[in-house]
């Protein structure tokens, strides 16, 4: 059995080497971006959900730059962030241009910190993205708090942040955080009340044969609060019918959009996949911004897509397609291939609902031009 495993691993390594060599030739020495590296990630038993998100984040340049800058800081105790920084640094400093890296240290730490990921079952890529970004933000805030307590902040001995105040935003927030405003208008007195809510990614409902722009408009559709759902108006001092809608008040540097492709079916007692065809353009402008939004005409470029292949949340596979400089790459665990921009259309989804098994965009990463 052990000999068979060794032979299998050797064959896999040979395949990886051949794939890497082919990729380097296809891009060509003159076109290959300076100081760029394209490395696949070894799958440690259904860790494609993790590999695909890590590849997408690596090619979100503002995020990559911050993680690499963190690596250059004085050594800290091991955390998920230090393991991520080590992985990104390992990719960025390879002598070879293309190849394969085992993210073993990161996976080991992830499984140690969160029992949800401590098994060999398929996990949800969006849940992992959410967990990773929030964990990194928590680590950075805790480190800043410790620095303040130790009196190492440059702004002197004055601690402007008491225990009950909101922590300062981290670079995770600076890159991914946007703000939604929830507007409610009383239909009796016309008073508008609004409540702001921060987000690191937006989850949007999907419909058949639509676009991501349509999904975002649906996200901001006006909802009527009536009957038992009436709104308590402070001005009227009673429950009234009202209109409620959600709009984007602050656009993030990188807009992460999660397409809600998994729906719980009561008759089946399980989640099933909505393989609907949802077009996501290479360029995006949001039209559901609030009146007081800063830079409402901000343009975004698609930089990465996490794709779900299969028929359900706990079955199937995840891959990533990313834009690097002027071309697109597909990362399928340890395999890396160059693809045409037109090939992205293959990941929109299916026009027919008959076949649920599909390769469809699940998390989209759009980067602001400014």
UniProtKB/Swiss-Prot annotation:
Residues 39-369 form the USP domain. Zn(2+) binds at residues 186, 189, 233, 236. GO terms for biological process: protein deubiquitination; proteolysis; regulation of protein stability. PROSITE patterns: USP_1, USP_2, USP_3. InterPro entries: Papain-like_cys_pep_sf, Peptidase_C19, Peptidase_C19_UCH, USP_CS, USP_dom. Pfam families: UCH. It catalyses: Thiol-dependent hydrolysis of ester, thioester, amide, peptide and isopeptide bonds formed by the C-terminal Gly of ubiquitin (a 76-residue protein attached to proteins as an intracellular targeting signal). Residues 146-168 are annotated as: Disordered. Activated by interaction with WDR20, WDR48 and DMWD through different allosteric mechanisms. A motif (Required for plasma membrane localization of USP12/WDR20) lies at residues 1-4. GO terms for molecular function: cysteine-type deubiquitinase activity; cysteine-type endopeptidase activity; deubiquitinase activity; metal ion binding. Its main location: nucleus. One of its GO terms (cellular component) is nucleus. It comes from the Eukaryota. The active site is at 48 (nucleophile), 317 (proton acceptor). Its EC number is 3.4.19.12. Keywords: Cell membrane, Cytoplasm, Hydrolase, Membrane, Metal-binding, Nucleus, Protease, Thiol protease, Ubl conjugation pathway, Zinc. It is found in: Nucleus; Cytoplasm; Cell membrane. Residues 146-157 have a biased composition (Basic and acidic residues). Belongs to the peptidase C19 family. USP12/USP46 subfamily. Interacts with WDR48. Interacts with WDR20; this interaction promotes translocation of the USP12 complex to the plasma membrane. Component of the USP12-WDR20-WDR48 deubiquitinating complex. Component of the USP12-DMWD-WDR48 deubiquitinating complex. Interacts with PHLPP1. Interacts with RBPJ. Interacts with CBP; this interaction blocks the acetyltransferase activity of CREBBP. Interacts with ITCH; the interaction is more efficient when both USP12 and WDR48/UAF1 are involved and may mediate recruitment of the USP12 deubiquitinating complex to Notch. Deubiquitinating enzyme that plays various roles in the regulation of the immune response and inflammation. During TCR engagement and activation, translocates into the cytoplasm and deubiquitinates its substrates LAT and TRAT1 and prevents their lysosome-dependent degradation to stabilize the TCR signaling complex at the plasma membrane. Plays an essential role in the selective LPS-induced macrophage response through the activation of NF-kappa-B pathway. In addition, promotes that antiviral immune response through targeting DNA sensor IFI16 to inhibit its proteasome-dependent degradation. This is Ubiquitin carboxyl-terminal hydrolase 12. It comes from Rattus norvegicus (Rat). The lineage of its organism: Eukaryota, Metazoa, Chordata, Craniata, Vertebrata.
């Amino acid at each position: 059995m052990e000999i068979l495993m060794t032979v299998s691993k050797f064959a896999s390594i040979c395949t990886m080497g051949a794939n890497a060599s082919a990729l380097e030739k296809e891009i060509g020495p003159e076109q290959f971006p300076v100081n760029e590296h394209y490395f696949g990630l070894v799958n440690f038993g259904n860790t494609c959900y993790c590999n695909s998100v890590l590849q997408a984040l690596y090619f979100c340049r503002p995020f990559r730059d911050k993680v690499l800058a963190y690596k250059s800081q004085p050594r800290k105790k091991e955390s998920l962030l230090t393991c991520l920084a080590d992985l990104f640094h390992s990719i960025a400093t390879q002598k070879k241009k293309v190849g394969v890296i085992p993210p073993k240290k990161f996976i080991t730490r992830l499984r140690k910190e969160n029992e949800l990921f401590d098994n060999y079952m398929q996990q949800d890529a969006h849940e992992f993205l959410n967990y990773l970004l929030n964990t990194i933000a928590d680590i950075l805030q805790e480190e800043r708090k410790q620095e303040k307590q130790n009196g190492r902040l440059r702004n002197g001995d004055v601690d402007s942040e008491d225990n009950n105040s909101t922590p300062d935003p981290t670079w995770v927030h600076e890159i991914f955080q946007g703000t939604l405003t929830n507007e409610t208008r009383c239909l009796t007195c016309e008073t508008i009340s609004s409540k702001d809510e921060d987000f690191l990614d937006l989850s949007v409902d999907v419909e058949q044969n639509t676009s991501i722009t349509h999904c975002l408009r649906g996200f901001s559709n006006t909802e009527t609060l009536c009957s038992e759902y009436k709104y308590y108006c402070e001005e009227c001092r009673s429950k009234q019918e009202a209109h409620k809608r959600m709009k984007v008040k602050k656009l993030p540097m990188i807009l992460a959009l999660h397409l809600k492709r998994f729906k719980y079916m009561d008759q089946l007692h399980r989640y099933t996949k909505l393989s609907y065809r949802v077009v996501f353009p290479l360029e995006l402008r949001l039209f559901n911004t609030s009146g007081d939004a800063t830079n409402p005409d901000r343009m975004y470029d698609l930089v990465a897509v996490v794709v779900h292949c299969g028929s359900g949340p706990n079955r199937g596979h995840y891959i990533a397609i990313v834009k690097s400089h002027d071309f697109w790459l597909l990362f399928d665990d340890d395999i890396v291939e160059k693809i045409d921009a037109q090939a992205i259309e293959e990941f929109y989804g299916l026009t027919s609902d008959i076949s649920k098994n599909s390769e469809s965009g699940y998390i989209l990463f759009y980067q602001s031009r400014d």
